[in-house]
Amino acid sequence: MSLKFKSIAAISALIGTLTLVGCGPTEKAPNHIKVGVIVGAEQQVAEVAQKVAKEKYGLDVELVTFNDYVLPNEALSKGDIDLNAFQHKPYLDQQIKDRGYKLVSVGNSFVYPIAGYSKKIKSLDELQPGSQVALPNDPTNLGRSLLLLQSVGLIKLKDGVGLLPTVLDVVENPKNLKLVELEAPQLPRSLDDQQIALAIINTTYASQIGLTPAKDGLFVEDKESPYVNLIVAREDNKDAENVKKFVQAYQSDEVYDAANKAFNGGAVKGW
């Protein structure tokens, strides 16, 4: 190989290396943020926040959708996304305790009340002894559902159980109801199961089959519920400017109006 050819080859190799370095994922776009949300009505609400963030703050929001409550925190912890907006504080606290996540709330969003739904009965007076009642199986929403059942007199829980009771804390069950724990996304479908008389469903999943607490719920969680949903970041990015911009965009009148529309009046402002 001639000296001249060697020089040309070396220069070409250097240019190629520089090109690869320049195009590599070494830095995130300065005005870009990835936000995890649950598919369905919450996604529709987040899409309005996405628009507000762009128009008011010049922030490009990429929405990443999930079908369950477990993966959004895992993705956030790994750095696959920058924020998520889907969970209430008791759930976040339990996830941090169980999985050691270094996650933190950076703002409130909405309270989405849970409610009791049925395709078999029209009132609780029709609920027969021994009926099966479907509940979400994750610890915080299970506890939330048991507290709701207690509030309407279907069960009684031990004193002092706090926000995380389990079925083992049921001390009175006058109708001998069979409490069946299911994955939250399965609860809407459980209404078609002939064995299930009643299901306690989060508004996020109920809305996916056209149900709303005010119109379709046999009984509904009180609006003073402590289960306000949160916008969550990692401890290492909680103070980032893009995070603050997204929170401001989400806590806007436009997003509140969108939430009320998406949930047919079932969203309560949490800020």
Swiss-Prot record:
It is a lipid-anchor. SUPFAM superfamilies: Periplasmic binding protein-like II. A lipid is attached at C23 (N-palmitoyl cysteine). It comes from the Bacteria. The keyword Cell cycle does not apply. Its main location: membrane. One of its GO terms (biological process) is methionine import across plasma membrane. The keyword Lipoprotein applies. Residues 1-22 form the signal peptide. It is found in: Cell membrane. Keywords: Amino-acid transport, Cell membrane, Lipoprotein, Membrane, Palmitate, Signal, Transport. It holds the Pfam family Lipoprotein_9. Belongs to the NlpA lipoprotein family. The MetNIQ system is also to be able to transport the toxic methionine analog alpha-methyl-methionine. This is D-methionine-binding lipoprotein MetQ. It comes from Yersinia pestis.
